[in-house]
Amino acid sequence: ETLLSFISLEDGVFSMVFEFSWCQLELKGPNYFWYDRQEWTPEDLKRELFSSHEMAGDRGWFGVCTENHDQPRSIDHYLPREGRNYYGATMLASMYLLLRGTPYVYQGQEIGMRNCAYASMDDYNDVSTHNQYNRALADGFSPEEALRLVQLESRDNARTPFQWDDTENAGFTTGKPWLKVNPNYTELNAAQEERDEDSVLAWYKKMIGLRLHSQWSELISEGTFAPAYREEKNLIAYRRRFEGKALLVLCNMQPEERE
C-alpha cells in the first residue's frame, strides 16, 4: 500500500522502482547479517514475487531483475546445487524476462556467470564483505566459517571481470584486473556462447526477441499479470493477458522433470 503510493502510474512519485523483497530470502531481517541465515523454499520466492506484482497490478511499474552489483550471481543464489546448469539458468531468465515491468540484464548474467569463491580474504575488495567477515569472527565464527559465508554472499561475486573469451584475464584486459577473474572463464565465456545455438546467451536473445519483436511483444510489455497454479509446489507460474491473447509461463524450480 505504501509502495503503491510511490509507484502509481497515475499519481505516484516515481515512474518505476526496483523491488527487492525477494532478493535476500536466505537472510533474517532486520540486520541481514550474512551469518544469520534461514532456510527458504521456492514457495517463499513465489509468495514475495507474486505479492509485489499483484499489488502493483496495472497501476505501478517495476524494474525487474534477478542480479545486480550488490547481489551474488543468480544461478548460485536461487538454484540448488544440482540445478545450477543450462536448464536452471534459462528457467530463471524466462521467469523474470516475461514479467510485467522493465527487465534489466546485469553484465555477465546473459552468459550465466557464476559466483567466484576466492580462497583468501585478501582477494576481496568490497568493504561490506570485510565488515561482514569481521562481524562473523567477532560473534564466534571461525575464519573458515566466516570465509564460507563471504563466498556465498559477497558483492564481489558479481563484480569480477566480464568473461569475453578464453584468453588471459578472460579477454578483459592485458593489465592487472581489479579482481581476479573467475577461473571458470576458460569454459564459460561470451565467445564460446556466441558459437553455441543452445547456450544461455542464445536463450537470452530468444527471450528478448520474444519480448521486443514478436506477435507476443505487446502482451509481454503491456499485459496484465496473474498467478497460476499457485498451490503447486516448486512451480512458479503466471499468466499474462492482453486484448484477447494469453501467455502461460511455467518455471519448474526443482531439478526433476514434471508434468
Regions found by a protein language model. Give the residues of each.
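Active-site and adjacent substrate-binding regions of carbohydrate-active enzymes
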Residues: 1-259
